């Protein structure tokens, strides 16, 4: 068994244990492998071990990997900040976008989604920690944004995403994820997705209702931050 396959098995066990501890069916928690800065060969290895969903932050890097891996049935999720001039290739080449935080971006994604493709699954990114350096809409702006995005014809609004302020305190982790869950429930729009939790806090996220956990380091090892950030 490869190192990546071993890591996938370990993370799957963590997900299973966390879901069971929360009284949830482990099948309701999706494992999104964050493959940013990792080579296509690592994605291919993860696919061979059973993964199908991969998250990317950097558009040009992602498009290169997608071309290399076109022979595989993969679902690609864009999870990084979105610039207006990058929306067309995102709309054309991804199945999910987790990081929509303003209406202009959502409108462009809807307008640029090719007619032959199903609606693009989107999550709205919320800045639950109030950090000035973090992307995401403010919680008080979320209801209006969600109502507007839900009307766009080529998008399917699925739920919310957050990247809370990193903390080793389990209570603080739970509080941030609970906040996102409450925001989703308050919208009362029948949405089904909470994209939250990473390698160090997936247990707390699952305890508060995560349906996608975004895992990079625990699967692929430490990231190569020298990779191109375009």
Swiss-Prot record:
Swiss-Prot/TrEMBL keywords: Pyridoxal phosphate
Chain positions found as N6-(pyridoxal phosphate)lysine: 36
GO molecular function, one term: pyridoxal phosphate binding
GO cellular component, one term: cytoplasm
Gene3D superfamilies: Alanine racemase
Covalent S-S links between cysteines: none
SUPFAM superfamilies: PLP-binding barrel
Family membership noted in the UniProt record: Belongs to the pyridoxal phosphate-binding protein YggS/PROSC family.
Role, per record: Perhaps involved in proline biosynthesis.
Protein name according to UniProt: Pyridoxal phosphate homeostasis protein
Organism: Pseudomonas aeruginosa (strain ATCC 15692 / DSM 22644 / CIP 104116 / JCM 14847 / LMG 12228 / 1C / PRS 101 / PAO1)
């Amino acid at each position: 068994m490869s190192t990546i396959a071993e890591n996938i098995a370990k993370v799957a066990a963590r997900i299973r244990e966390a879901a069971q501890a929360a009284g949830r069916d482990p099948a309701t928690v999706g494992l999104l492998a964050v493959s940013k800065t990792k080579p296509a060969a690592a994605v291919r290895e993860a696919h061979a071990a059973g993964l199908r969903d991969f998250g990317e932050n950097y558009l040009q890097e992602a498009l290169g990997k997608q071309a290399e891996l076109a022979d595989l049935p993969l679902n690609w999720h864009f999870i990084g900040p979105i610039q207006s001039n990058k929306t067309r290739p995102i709309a054309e080449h991804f199945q999910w976008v987790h990081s929509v935080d303003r209406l202009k971006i959502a409108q462009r994604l809807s307008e640029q989604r090719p007619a032959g493709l199903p609606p693009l699954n989107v999550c709205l990114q919320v800045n639950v920690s109030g950090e000035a350096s973090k992307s995401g809409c403010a919680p008080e702006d979320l209801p209006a944004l969600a109502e507007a995005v839900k009307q766009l014809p080529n998008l399917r609004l699925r739920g919310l995403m957050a990247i809370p302020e990193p903390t080793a305190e389990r209570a603080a982790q739970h509080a941030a994820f609970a906040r996102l869950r409450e925001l989703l429930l308050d919208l009362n729009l029948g949405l089904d997705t909470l994209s939250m939790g990473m390698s160090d806090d997936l247990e707390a996220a699952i305890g508060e209702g995560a349906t996608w956990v975004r895992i990079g380091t625990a699967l692929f090892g430490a990231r190569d931050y020298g990779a191109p950030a375009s």
